[in-house]
Amino acid sequence: MSQLYDITIVGGGPVGLFAAFYAHLRQAKVQIIDSLPQLGGQPAILYPEKEILDVPGFPNLTGEELTNRLIEQLNGFDTPIHLNETVLEIDKQEEEFAITTSKGSHLTKTVIIAMGGGAFKPRPLELEGVEDYENIHYHVSNIQQYAGKKVTILGGGDSAVDWALAFEKIAPTTLVHRRDNFRALEHSVQALQESSVTIKTPFAPSQLLGDGKTLDKLEITKVKSDETETIDLDHLFVNYGFKSSVGNLKNWGLDLNRHKIIVNSKQESSQAGIYAIGDCCYYDGKIDLIATGLGEAPTAVNNAINYIDPEQKVQPKHSTSL
């Protein structure tokens, strides 16, 4: 028979990790279920060396460092962690919820869903032969290995701009974007414009030039024009964002808004006892940032505690008084 937990957290990214830690402060019995093979979510797997700019008080904090600190914080408590385990169904029983996964079942009094954007994979560069080239990349695991190399980055969002600024410190860097304007933080765009990064706008990649294994040059074409240019490069990084899939979420009986779980001011979904935090939840004015999700975690945990035992106050003691 499965153990009965007070809170089961679905998702082991930064927001889920902090929710688990905070739940322990409320002396809840908590576990984490994550479909990925490691904790940390996108920052750990896709952006381990990228600076995280929206966690206050920690300048130059990388995705890997953020993950390690959250795990270290959680290590002081007994937290069962189930990795490579996908949640298939969440069914309301009389007194608890039964969670069916790809590996078994779990019983829990409440559920906090912190699954981010769900399963994710990078949006690919769609040019002939792209799969054959070994020096086309979609994420960076060790930036120092590219020191002194000619780097070209495709994209116009925060990731593309941030990586261009990071690579500029160690390598000749070119940034190619199909529009004149970048979809990144204003401060980052200003830093880009003041940097030594070569900016090519509005251009789109049109042809890969190499021996079929190593890409040597990238042909780019000006948007709405026949004008072309050729860029010499050693490595090409594609930052076109990610395709995400919420998988079985639509089968869990929760009210959704464009694949996000609608929550109230308690972070509670349409099903009492099930809460959602981070990028997977929706409410009017919602901003998808790590900092936002970290703030939502205590709200969900405290209301889950109150759901389990209405005599427990939603507003707990401050951590400084514990």
Swiss-Prot record:
Keyword Signal: no
Enzyme class, UniProt record, top EC level: oxidoreductase
Catalytic activity entry: 2 reduced [2Fe-2S]-[ferredoxin] + NADP(+) + H(+) = 2 oxidized [2Fe-2S]-[ferredoxin] + NADPH
Keywords: FAD, Flavoprotein, NADP, Oxidoreductase
EC number: 1.18.1.2
Cofactor comment: Binds 1 FAD per subunit.
SUPFAM superfamilies hit by this protein: FAD/NAD(P)-binding domain
Cofactor(s) recorded in Swiss-Prot or TrEMBL: FAD
Binding site for FAD: 34, 42, 47, 87, 120, 279, 320
GO molecular function: ferredoxin-NADP+ reductase activity; flavin adenine dinucleotide binding; NADP binding; thioredoxin-disulfide reductase (NADPH) activity
Signal sequence annotation: none
GO biological process: cell redox homeostasis
InterPro entries: FAD/NAD-bd_sf, FAD/NAD-binding_dom, Fd--NADP_Rdtase_type_2, Ferredoxin-NADP_redctase_2
Domain of life: Bacteria
Family: Belongs to the ferredoxin--NADP reductase type 2 family.
Subunit and interaction comment: Homodimer.
Name of the protein in its database record: Ferredoxin--NADP reductase
